[in-house]
Amino acid sequence: FTCDVLGFEIAGTKLNSAACGAHCLALGRRGGYCNSKSVCVCR
């Protein structure tokens, strides 16, 4: 699951990290973030 797929901004706020976090929560993880290579990293 890469962050560039859902990477867009609203009012200067990037939502790709939010999508990544939601993806990780759906997998039962504690959230996640997008790294410098636009890859979703779950906690």
UniProtKB/Swiss-Prot annotation:
Record's subcellular location: Secreted
InterPro entries according to UniProt: Defensin_invertebrate/fungal, Scorpion_toxin-like_sf
Cellular component, GO, one term: extracellular space
Signal peptide range: none
Keywords, in A-Z order: Antibiotic, Antimicrobial, Defensin, Disulfide bond, Immunity, Innate immunity, Secreted
Intrachain S-S bonds: C3-C34, C20-C40, C24-C42
Main localization (coarse): secreted
Gene Ontology annotations of biological process type: defense response to bacterium; humoral immune response; innate immune response
Family according to the record: Belongs to the invertebrate defensin family. Type 1 subfamily.
Purpose of the protein: Involved in anti Gram-positive activity of immune hemolymph of Z.atratus.
Protein name per UniProt: Defensin, isoforms B and C
